[in-house]
Amino acid sequence: MRLCLIPWNTTPHRVLPPVVWSAPSRKKPVLSARNSMMFGHLSPVRNPRLRGKFNLQLPSLDEQVIPTRLPKMEVRAEEPKEATEVKDQVETQGQEDNKTGPCSNGKAASTSRPLETQGNLTSSWYNPRPLEGNVHLKSLTEKNQTDKAQVHAVSFYSKGHGVTSSHSPAGGILPFGKPDPLPAVLPAPVPDCSLWPEKAALKVLGKDHLPSSPGLLMVGEDMQPKDPAALRSSRSSPPRAAGHRPRKRKLSGPPLQLQQTPPLQLRWDRDEGPPPAKLPCLSPEALLVGKASQREGRLQQGNMRKNVRVLSRTSKFRRLRQLLRRRKKRWQGRRGGSRL
């Protein structure tokens, strides 16, 4: 047998290594299915082929439903043909005015052009710009109706009726074709204001020459212009002062007087409190009866207490007597038994 000792280098100093006595094995390693992984070369793992076949069912592109959002329909309001023609005329007239320029004398040039151009200007103010975005059909129809009514009013105005002016003679009416010495300039149109064109048309047209359009007839009585005579009287009359106001009616007869209540008369001073309430006065006979009843009640209560005491005493004495008798009997029995 051979002895295999462990070398000294593996153990620390001053410590003896343990000696293992084992016999060496003469058997050689044999490759087998178990230890082939330990001693042999590693071979790649091969997966067996799939014998069964299966088909993958994928949805076709035609059957797939792709959710999409419908685009919003944009409706644009088209201008009427009459309004576009009027707008073109106004642009050409504006270019001609820019070419001529202001007068050399420094004064404003008078409006010598016919009043049709002024009518076209007003009609260009009345016609709105093309609308963009989502527009309801109801609002489109209403605006088209108002535009047609305004164009009708301008055409009625340009046929030869008079024009009201603040500086014109004969009732404030100028004949057709003559310029106004100081023409009244209408204010600029306010956006999002549907009543402004109707107000301007009512100021330009007279009361007798109002057109039969539904847009202008809807305006109230305050919007309609007054007669020239009424306008003269209103201008000539000075403004009333703030003091001239209708006074109220005065009540006829003397004013009603309220009855004054007399002050409370106190029988005691303010610092002192009220006197104590008095008890009701009783007759002497009633007092005597009350005292007698009180005495009887007291006597009854005293008698009850005495009776309770007596009963308690008698019961105690009876109990004591019974106890004494029992003791005597016991003593007598003991003595008699001891003697026997």
Swiss-Prot record:
Residues 228-241, 254-266 have a biased composition (Low complexity). Residues 75-90 have a biased composition (Basic and acidic residues). InterPro entries: POM121-like_prot_1. Residues 91-126 have a biased composition (Polar residues). Signal peptide: none annotated. Residues 242-251 have a biased composition (Basic residues). Residues 75-130, 215-281 are annotated as: Disordered. Belongs to the UPF0607 family. This is Putative UPF0607 protein ENSP00000332738. It comes from Homo sapiens (Human).
